[in-house]
Design a protein with these regions (language model features):
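Membrane-embedded beta-barrel scaffold of Gram-negative outer-membrane proteins
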Residues: 2, 60, 68, 101-154, ...
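C-terminal beta-signal and adjacent terminal beta-strands/loops
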Residues: 227-235, 258-320
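Transmembrane beta-strands of outer-membrane beta-barrel pores
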Residues: 1-4, 17, 39-45, 59, ...
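Transmembrane beta-strands of outer-membrane beta-barrel proteins
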Residues: 1, 35-37, 67-69, 108, ...
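Gram-negative outer-membrane beta-barrel transporters
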Residues: 28-32, 125-134, 154-235, 316-318
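Surface-exposed extracellular loop regions of Gram-negative outer-membrane beta-barrel proteins
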Residues: 12-44, 50-54, 168-186
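Outer-membrane beta-barrel strand-turn architecture
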Residues: 23, 27-31, 59-63, 104, ...
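Residues on the lipid-exposed face of transmembrane beta-strands in outer-membrane beta-barrel proteins
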Residues: 21-27, 55-59, 110-114, 164-170, ...
């Protein structure tokens, strides 16, 4: 592999040699029971031998029910300046305290999918998952030790994430379609025996996309949105007047599309219907915003879009 660009991500050109082999075998235990075995071996000229096995089991008790269990390991080499954009914002000094080791993980996932078809043509799909992931050598940005620094090091301990998620997919014969999902998780970092919550990570979230077609009016209405729970934010020490946790917040949009013409569609709508921005109720969102080149400028606290309510109009032309 060879990669170079004109950003700080590659101050010098990066060359990596990786030799890999991947094997996979599906075993049919019975008509409704399948096992998938997989293994990957890599040799990295910087990190040596890497072996990542995986196993998956699938059970179809009926044509409308599917159970899955997956377990395996992971391996990841982190590039701070392409993945951790906070390192390039604000006036905080970036401190790397050691030669960073690759992250490794162990995970298990349970999944259930249910499909229901009603006599009137309505389709209802339900999917739920539960998972657990354990990380070694995870690279965590430390905003707390020194408010003027972002300190990067491999976690001297472990990190874990335990969560559940669900999705509902509804399609009706009278023009209504809906996809609604949620995620609840419990992330935790343990450093030197001390447990903490990762910054900029919400414990629950939801999303939805609802469409209603009105053929006699040649009209389609789309309503989409996201909901986010509180997340811990990187404040500048005990004297920082900004809240340590974000509020519950939501971004919601609506769009109307007129489809009477063969190749043209007219559309318009409103983005951020609730006119929510993260600076509401906060003394100041960005530290030192009046002097973006000053020593106190810090944009790491920004956790959501800053654009308020706005409208839009457009024309869509279909060639084929």
């Amino acid at each position: 592999q060879y990669y170079n660009d004109n950003t700080t991500a590659t101050i010098s050109a990066e060359k990596t040699k990786i030799y890999s082999i991947f094997l996979q075998d599906e075993i049919k235990l019975a008509p409704k029971h399948h096992i998938l075995l997989g293994a990957r071996y890599d040799y990295n000229n910087n990190h040596g031998n890497i072996f990542t096995p995986r196993i998956a089991y699938k059970w179809n008790p009926t044509e409308n029910d599917v159970f899955r269990i997956n377990a395996g390991t992971g391996f990841r080499i982190v590039n701070l300046f392409t993945e951790e954009h906070a390192a390039l914002t604000g006036s905080r000094d970036v401190i790397i305290t050691e030669d960073l080791k690759p992250e490794t993980s162990y995970n298990i996932n349970f999944n259930y999918l249910k499909k229901i078809r009603f006599e009137n043509g309505t389709f209802l799909g339900f999917e739920t998952s539960a998972w657990y992931t354990y990380f070694n050598n995870q690279i965590i940005p430390d905003y707390d030790t020194n408010p003027n620094q972002i300190i990067y090091s491999n976690l001297n301990g472990y990190a874990q994430t335990l969560g559940i998620s669900g999705n509902i997919d509804l399609v009706t014969p009278f023009g209504l379609k809906a996809i609604v999902g949620f995620t609840i998780m419990e992330p935790k970092n343990v450093q030197n025996g001390v447990s903490s919550t990762p910054v900029l990570t919400e414990k629950y979230s939801a999303n939805w996309a609802i469409t209603y077609d009105i053929p006699k009016w040649f009209l389609s209405i789309d309503y989409t949105g996201n909901l986010y729970g509180p997340m811990r934010l990187p404040i500048l020490g005990d004297l920082d007047p900004r809240p340590e946790y974000s509020p519950i917040w939501s971004l919601q949009n609506i769009q109307f599309t007129y489809k009477k013409f063969r190749s043209f569609e007219l559309y318009g709508g409103v983005k951020n219907i609730l006119n929510w921005t993260p600076n509401k109720g906060t003394p100041y969102l960005i530290a030192g915003a009046e002097d973006p080149f000053g020593e106190n400028f810090d944009a790491t606290y920004v956790y959501a879009p800053n654009q308020g309510i706005r409208g839009f109009l457009g024309i869509r032309y279909t060639i084929f």
